[in-house]
Amino acid sequence: MRTATKTRVTAETSIELSINLDSQVESTISTGVGFLDHMLTLFAKHSRVTLNVKADGDTYVDAHHTVEDIGITLGLCLKEALADKASINRYGSAYVPMDESLGFCALDLSGRSYLVFDAELTNPKLGDFDTELVEEFFQAVAFNTEMNLHLRVLYGKNTHHKIEALFKAFGRALREAITINPEIKGVNSTKGVL
Protein backbone atom coordinates (compact mmCIF):
# COMPACT_ATOMS: atom_id res chain seq x y z
CA MET A 1 0.00 0.00 0.00
CA ARG A 2 1.26 3.47 -0.90
CA THR A 3 0.59 5.53 2.21
CA ALA A 4 2.09 8.41 4.15
CA THR A 5 1.37 10.31 7.35
CA LYS A 6 2.87 13.67 8.28
CA THR A 7 2.55 16.12 11.14
CA ARG A 8 3.56 19.74 10.62
CA VAL A 9 3.62 22.08 13.60
CA THR A 10 4.61 25.74 13.39
CA ALA A 11 3.88 28.80 15.51
CA GLU A 12 0.89 29.39 13.20
CA THR A 13 -0.59 25.95 12.49
CA SER A 14 -0.76 22.33 13.54
CA ILE A 15 -1.48 19.90 10.70
CA GLU A 16 -1.97 16.12 10.83
CA LEU A 17 -2.45 14.57 7.39
CA SER A 18 -2.50 11.01 6.06
CA ILE A 19 -3.10 9.67 2.58
CA ASN A 20 -3.63 6.22 1.10
CA LEU A 21 -3.26 6.15 -2.67
CA ASP A 22 -4.54 2.59 -3.06
CA SER A 23 -7.69 2.50 -0.96
CA GLN A 24 -10.72 4.72 -0.98
CA VAL A 25 -12.76 4.84 2.17
CA GLU A 26 -14.54 7.87 3.53
CA SER A 27 -12.10 10.71 4.15
CA THR A 28 -12.19 12.76 7.34
CA ILE A 29 -11.32 16.40 6.76
CA SER A 30 -11.45 19.16 9.37
CA THR A 31 -9.29 22.19 8.60
CA GLY A 32 -11.17 25.00 10.31
CA VAL A 33 -11.71 26.47 6.82
CA GLY A 34 -15.09 25.31 5.56
CA PHE A 35 -14.54 26.01 1.88
CA LEU A 36 -11.20 24.16 1.93
CA ASP A 37 -12.86 21.17 3.64
CA HIS A 38 -15.33 21.08 0.74
CA MET A 39 -12.60 21.28 -1.93
CA LEU A 40 -10.38 18.64 -0.26
CA THR A 41 -13.36 16.29 0.03
CA LEU A 42 -13.97 16.69 -3.72
CA PHE A 43 -10.26 16.17 -4.45
CA ALA A 44 -10.19 12.95 -2.40
CA LYS A 45 -13.30 11.59 -4.10
CA HIS A 46 -12.12 12.32 -7.63
CA SER A 47 -8.54 11.13 -7.07
CA ARG A 48 -9.95 7.98 -5.40
CA VAL A 49 -7.64 8.27 -2.40
CA THR A 50 -8.32 8.22 1.32
CA LEU A 51 -7.36 11.58 2.79
CA ASN A 52 -7.51 12.44 6.48
CA VAL A 53 -6.74 16.00 7.57
CA LYS A 54 -6.93 17.61 11.00
CA ALA A 55 -5.76 21.20 11.17
CA ASP A 56 -5.72 23.95 13.75
CA GLY A 57 -4.47 27.32 12.62
CA ASP A 58 -4.50 31.02 13.26
CA THR A 59 -7.68 31.50 11.27
CA TYR A 60 -8.53 34.47 13.50
CA VAL A 61 -5.90 36.26 11.36
CA ASP A 62 -7.04 34.69 8.09
CA ALA A 63 -6.84 31.28 6.41
CA HIS A 64 -3.55 31.87 4.58
CA HIS A 65 -1.21 29.94 6.90
CA THR A 66 -3.64 27.05 7.30
CA VAL A 67 -4.30 26.68 3.57
CA GLU A 68 -0.61 26.93 2.63
CA ASP A 69 0.56 24.54 5.37
CA ILE A 70 -2.05 21.95 4.38
CA GLY A 71 -0.78 22.24 0.79
CA ILE A 72 2.80 21.74 2.00
CA THR A 73 1.84 18.72 4.10
CA LEU A 74 -0.27 17.16 1.34
CA GLY A 75 2.63 17.59 -1.08
CA LEU A 76 5.08 15.95 1.32
CA CYS A 77 2.69 13.03 1.87
CA LEU A 78 2.20 12.54 -1.86
CA LYS A 79 5.95 12.55 -2.41
CA GLU A 80 6.52 9.97 0.34
CA ALA A 81 3.63 7.72 -0.71
CA LEU A 82 4.85 7.67 -4.32
CA ALA A 83 8.36 6.66 -3.16
CA ASP A 84 10.46 5.76 -6.24
CA LYS A 85 7.42 6.15 -8.57
CA ALA A 86 8.02 2.71 -10.09
CA SER A 87 5.52 1.69 -12.78
CA ILE A 88 3.25 4.74 -12.43
CA ASN A 89 1.87 6.47 -15.51
CA ARG A 90 3.62 9.67 -14.34
CA TYR A 91 1.44 11.98 -16.45
CA GLY A 92 -2.21 12.83 -15.99
CA SER A 93 -4.72 15.30 -17.39
CA ALA A 94 -8.42 16.00 -17.08
CA TYR A 95 -11.09 18.43 -18.18
CA VAL A 96 -13.94 18.85 -15.70
CA PRO A 97 -17.12 20.86 -16.30
CA MET A 98 -18.96 22.38 -13.36
CA ASP A 99 -22.16 23.87 -14.72
CA GLU A 100 -21.05 26.92 -16.79
CA SER A 101 -17.35 26.58 -15.86
CA LEU A 102 -14.70 24.33 -17.41
CA GLY A 103 -11.51 23.48 -15.56
CA PHE A 104 -8.40 21.74 -16.86
CA CYS A 105 -5.41 20.14 -15.16
CA ALA A 106 -2.29 18.55 -16.61
CA LEU A 107 0.49 17.27 -14.39
CA ASP A 108 3.79 15.42 -14.50
CA LEU A 109 5.25 13.67 -11.44
CA SER A 110 8.68 14.47 -12.80
CA GLY A 111 10.56 15.41 -9.65
CA ARG A 112 10.67 19.00 -10.96
CA SER A 113 8.49 21.58 -9.24
CA TYR A 114 6.54 24.07 -11.30
CA LEU A 115 3.08 25.63 -11.21
CA VAL A 116 1.19 27.36 -13.99
CA PHE A 117 -2.07 28.75 -12.62
CA ASP A 118 -4.32 30.42 -15.18
CA ALA A 119 -7.65 31.18 -13.55
CA GLU A 120 -9.52 34.45 -13.33
CA LEU A 121 -11.27 34.26 -9.98
CA THR A 122 -13.39 37.39 -10.18
CA ASN A 123 -14.96 37.12 -6.73
CA PRO A 124 -12.18 37.77 -4.17
CA LYS A 125 -14.08 36.06 -1.34
CA LEU A 126 -16.37 33.06 -0.98
CA GLY A 127 -17.81 33.49 2.49
CA ASP A 128 -14.72 34.04 4.65
CA PHE A 129 -12.40 32.32 2.16
CA ASP A 130 -9.97 34.47 0.15
CA THR A 131 -9.99 32.99 -3.35
CA GLU A 132 -6.36 34.03 -3.96
CA LEU A 133 -5.46 31.20 -1.55
CA VAL A 134 -6.38 28.62 -4.20
CA GLU A 135 -3.19 29.42 -6.09
CA GLU A 136 -1.19 29.42 -2.82
CA PHE A 137 -2.53 25.95 -2.03
CA PHE A 138 -1.62 24.49 -5.41
CA GLN A 139 1.81 26.18 -5.32
CA ALA A 140 2.53 24.46 -2.00
CA VAL A 141 1.29 21.08 -3.26
CA ALA A 142 3.26 21.26 -6.51
CA PHE A 143 6.55 22.32 -4.94
CA ASN A 144 6.43 19.79 -2.10
CA THR A 145 5.32 16.87 -4.27
CA GLU A 146 7.91 17.95 -6.85
CA MET A 147 5.37 17.91 -9.65
CA ASN A 148 4.89 20.04 -12.73
CA LEU A 149 1.30 21.24 -12.36
CA HIS A 150 -0.75 23.22 -14.87
CA LEU A 151 -4.23 24.42 -13.91
CA ARG A 152 -6.53 26.49 -16.07
CA VAL A 153 -10.11 27.70 -16.05
CA LEU A 154 -11.06 27.87 -19.71
CA TYR A 155 -14.27 29.78 -19.04
CA GLY A 156 -16.98 30.30 -16.46
CA LYS A 157 -18.79 32.91 -14.41
CA ASN A 158 -19.30 31.55 -10.91
CA THR A 159 -16.09 31.63 -8.84
CA HIS A 160 -17.15 28.68 -6.68
CA HIS A 161 -17.79 26.59 -9.80
CA LYS A 162 -14.41 27.56 -11.29
CA ILE A 163 -12.50 26.51 -8.18
CA GLU A 164 -14.52 23.31 -7.81
CA ALA A 165 -13.75 22.39 -11.43
CA LEU A 166 -10.02 22.88 -10.73
CA PHE A 167 -9.98 20.70 -7.61
CA LYS A 168 -11.91 17.93 -9.36
CA ALA A 169 -9.67 18.14 -12.44
CA PHE A 170 -6.60 17.99 -10.20
CA GLY A 171 -7.97 14.89 -8.48
CA ARG A 172 -8.77 13.11 -11.72
CA ALA A 173 -5.42 14.01 -13.31
CA LEU A 174 -3.57 12.84 -10.21
CA ARG A 175 -5.42 9.51 -10.24
CA GLU A 176 -4.31 8.95 -13.84
CA ALA A 177 -0.69 9.86 -13.02
CA ILE A 178 -0.36 7.69 -9.88
CA THR A 179 -2.02 4.62 -11.39
CA ILE A 180 0.34 1.68 -11.62
CA ASN A 181 0.68 0.51 -15.21
CA PRO A 182 1.95 -3.09 -15.60
CA GLU A 183 3.37 -2.19 -19.02
CA ILE A 184 5.82 0.26 -17.41
CA LYS A 185 8.92 -1.46 -16.06
CA GLY A 186 10.73 0.66 -13.48
CA VAL A 187 10.16 4.39 -13.78
CA ASN A 188 8.58 6.11 -16.78
CA SER A 189 11.70 8.08 -17.74
CA THR A 190 14.69 7.60 -20.02
CA LYS A 191 16.82 8.93 -17.13
CA GLY A 192 15.93 5.92 -15.00
CA VAL A 193 14.83 8.09 -12.05
CA LEU A 194 12.09 10.60 -11.34
Swiss-Prot record:
Its main location: cytoplasm. Its EC number is 4.2.1.19. GO terms for cellular component: cytoplasm. Pathway: Amino-acid biosynthesis; L-histidine biosynthesis; L-histidine from 5-phospho-alpha-D-ribose 1-diphosphate: step 6/9. Gene3D superfamilies: Imidazole glycerol phosphate dehydratase, domain 1 (3.30.230.40). The keyword Amino-acid biosynthesis applies. GO terms for biological process: L-histidine biosynthetic process. Keywords: Amino-acid biosynthesis, Cytoplasm, Histidine biosynthesis, Lyase. Belongs to the imidazoleglycerol-phosphate dehydratase family. HAMAP family: HisB. This is Imidazoleglycerol-phosphate dehydratase. The gene is hisB.
